[in-house]
Each structure stands twice: as C-alpha cells, then as structure tokens.
C-alpha cells in the first residue's frame, strides 16, 4: 500500500510538472513575436515616416500658398513737411504738405505663380517617395534584426545542447577512471571540453542579447518576447531575367526621379523670371483746408537690360542642375542593378551551400561523432577522437546556422528593395 501511494505521488508530481511545462509552452506560443508583427510594430513606432509625411504636407501647403497672388501693400505718410521757417512742422499751412495713403500691388504673372506652385508639388511628391524609401529601409532593417535574433537563439541552443552532452562525457570519463578502465587524462580532457563550451555558450548568450537589443531599436520592448516560427525565406520577388525592369520601382530611384522633376520645375521658375511683373500703386494725398487734395496713379516694371548676363545664366544654371540630377539617377540605377544582381547571385549560391550542408556535411559529422562514441564505449577508440568529433560536429552546426543567417539577411535585402516585397515571392 505504501509503495502504491509513493508511486501515485510521483505520478501526480510528474503530471503537474508536465502540465505546467505544457502551459508555459502554450503561453509562449501565444505571446510569440511573429515576423510580420515585428514589421508592423516597426512601422508604427517609426518617427522617420511621420517626418516624411510632415515634409510632404508642408510642401503641399506651400504649393497652395505659391499659387496665390501677392498681398497688396498699404503705405501711409506725410510728404513735404516744413522743418524751418514760419510754417515749420505745420500740416496745413504749406500747399506742398500732404498726408498720403496709398495701396500698391505687384501683378505677378499666372505662369510664375503656377511654376512656383508646381515646384512645391514636385517637392511633395519627392517627400512621398522619400517615405516609401524610408519604409523600405525600415522593413529591411527590422527584418534583418528579427532574423539575427532568431538564428542567434538557434546557435545558443546548439551550443547549450552540446554542452549538456559534454557534461555526460565528463561523468562517463570519471566513472571509467574510478573503475580503473580509463586514464585520468580523459577526465581532464572532458572537463576542458566542457570549459571551452561554457565559454562558447557565454559568447552565444552575449550575441543573442545584442541581437535582442538591436531588434528593440526598431520595435521597442516587444523585442523581449519569444519569437515565432521562421518565415518562408525560400522565395524573393526578383528574377535575374527581369531584374532591370523590376528595379525601375526601386524607392531610391523613385526619389531621384522626383528630385529630377524638382530640378526641372526650377528651370521653369527661372524661365518665368525672365518676364518682368508690373506693379500698380494708387495714392490719395490730403493737403491743408485751403488747398486741393490730390490723387496719383503709378505703374512700375523692372528693366532687364542685361538679360544675357543674369536671367539667361540663371536658366542655364538650372538646366545644368537638372542634367546633373538625371546623370546621377542613371548612374545610381546602374549601381543598384549591379548590387541587386550580386545579392541575388549570393542568395542563390548560399541556398545551394545550405542544401549541401543538409544533405552531406551535417549527417557526416553526426555519424562521425556516433562512430567515435561507439568505439570509445567498446574500448576500441579514444576519448580524444570523441571530443574531436564533437568539436567538428558543433563547428558544422554553427557554420550551418551562420550560413542560414547570412542567407536570410540576403533574403531580407532582396525582399525589401521595395516595401512589402515578401508578399509576392518568386522561387529561385
């Protein structure tokens, strides 16, 4: 009866522990930070996107203001006031003294106002393109940070697992030594292997903490949550055969196109400045009670008598600036094409390497460790061979994870050349 009670108690304890572990696992899965959620959080927290929105709004407000005619100018004053003689400082005695009120306005041409408004509209479009570029950069950085943390966790788990296995090897070596069937040097060798793995585990934990911190730079405190499953990184939205056409939508190229449009709008402003505006002024002047009041009407217009040395040069300067913007855009397009092609080629080559790791390298290192362990247990092999095989196995596993991280980072670079590119992937 007592034995039955003891067994029942142990069963209940084990059941409670299993349920607790299961509950904790379920809670972690519910609270897991998915890849797409991280992208959404990064977009919600970004102040750069708000800054670009504000820039676009400011430019559109300026465009509306630039399309309006200038405000009239009100003038008031006293003209021809005597300062000496019997009538000094008198407003009424001298027939030339007048109190004047006037209104003037520059009659700015419609084409000038339209050119200025158009320029601000192009600035607003450039800001909108800048927002798309900022979103693309944000998604790429957030994706890379999420992937970095994911694989750093996997490295830490691999090292921790190897460390646990090495601890069992210490116990086995110590038992063999105490039983007189193994040398003491095997004990020290096993302990040294554990110490090396402890150091490696500390480095892996550090790398994981740094990766979590860098992810937090983009998504805040949510970076501390456990991560969900890895997204599908086997497809990218680009294809080498149509890469040049696809890069026409690259946000940075779009920004440069809009900046080029701003430069062309500056040309129109400079050309419109070669046509002078008229200014009209109406003034009413009141004299003393013994004299007649007066009214005057004036018009004025700037005389552009050295147009070839001033206005024409300003137009030429704006044309040269627009040509510079065009040349820079074309050069940047070529650079982006080469960079994207290099990224695509590297991603494809890495995927082939990963297949070799999975099909050949990792199974071989696992089999080598198993064979060395079997030989050691049957007293036909040495502990050094086991430890060497374990080192080779962990090196291969970590190298595989590092290659996976590099490949995933390349995937993020390719996927977010354009915002949301992962939504329409092409298997390469």
Where are these regions (language model features)?
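Residues that define the transmembrane beta-barrel architecture of outer-membrane proteins
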Residues: 95-99, 291-295
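Bacterial N-terminal signal peptides
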Residues: 10-20
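Periplasmic alpha-helical coiled-coil/stalk elements that build and connect Gram-negative outer-membrane
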Residues: 2-3, 33, 134-249, 343-350, ...
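Transmembrane beta-strands of outer-membrane beta-barrel pores
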Residues: 78-84, 107, 284-288, 301-305, ...
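Bacterial Sec-pathway N-terminal export signals of envelope proteins
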Residues: 23-85, 92, 106-107, 115, ...
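Short segments within alpha-helical structural elements
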Residues: 196-221, 364-420
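Acidic, low-complexity, intrinsically disordered peripheral segments
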Residues: 3-7, 26-29, 84, 399-428
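A glycine-/polar-enriched beta->alpha junction
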Residues: 40-50, 57-72, 101-118, 129-136, ...
């Amino acid at each position: 009866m007592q034995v039955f009670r003891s067994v029942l108690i142990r069963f209940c304890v084990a059941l409670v522990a299993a349920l607790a572990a299961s509950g904790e696992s379920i809670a972690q899965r519910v609270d897991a930070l998915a890849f797409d959620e991280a992208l959404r959080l990064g977009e919600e927290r970004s102040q750069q996107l708000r800054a670009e929105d504000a820039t676009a709004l400011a430019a559109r407000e300026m465009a509306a203001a630039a399309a309006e005619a200038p405000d009239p100018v009100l003038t008031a004053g006293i003209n021809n006031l005597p300062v000496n003689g019997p009538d000094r400082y008198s407003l009424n005695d001298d027939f030339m003294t007048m109190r004047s009120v006037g209104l003037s306005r520059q009659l700015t041409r419609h084409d000038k106002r339209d050119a200025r408004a158009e320029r601000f509209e192009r600035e607003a479009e450039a800001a909108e393109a800048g927002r798309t570029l900022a979103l693309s950069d944000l998604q790429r950085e957030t994706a890379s940070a999420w992937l970095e943390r994911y694989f750093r966790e996997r490295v830490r788990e691999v090292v921790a697992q190897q460390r646990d296995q090495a601890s069992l090897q210490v116990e086995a070596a110590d038992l063999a030594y105490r039983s007189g069937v193994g040398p003491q040097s095997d004990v020290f060798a096993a302990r040294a292997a554990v110490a090396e793995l402890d150091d490696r585990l500390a480095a892996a934990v550090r790398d994981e903490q740094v990766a979590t911190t860098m992810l937090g730079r983009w998504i805040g405190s949510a970076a501390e949550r456990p991560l969900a499953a890895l997204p599908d990184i086997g497809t990218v939205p680009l294809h080498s055969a149509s890469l040049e056409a696809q890069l026409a939508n690259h946000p940075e190229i779009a920004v440069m196109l809009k900046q080029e449009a701003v430069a062309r709008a500056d040309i129109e402003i400079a050309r419109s400045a070669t046509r002078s505006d008229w200014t009209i002024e109406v003034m009413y002047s009141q004299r003393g009670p013994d004299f007649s009041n007066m009214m005057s009407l004036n018009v004025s217009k700037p005389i552009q008598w050295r147009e070839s040395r001033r206005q024409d040069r300003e137009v030429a300067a704006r044309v040269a600036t627009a040509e510079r913007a065009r040349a820079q855009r074309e050069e940047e397009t070529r650079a982006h094409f080469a960079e994207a092609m290099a990224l695509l080629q590297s991603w494809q080559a890495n995927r082939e390497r990963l297949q070799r790791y999975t099909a050949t390298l990792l199974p071989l290192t696992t089999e080598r460790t198993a064979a060395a362990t079997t030989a050691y247990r049957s007293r036909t092999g040495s502990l050094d061979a086991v430890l060497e095989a374990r080192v080779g196995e962990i090196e291969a596993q970590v190298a595989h994870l590092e290659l996976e991280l590099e490949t995933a980072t390349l995937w993020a670079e390719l996927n977010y050349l354009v915002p949301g590119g992962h939504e329409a992937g092409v298997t390469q």
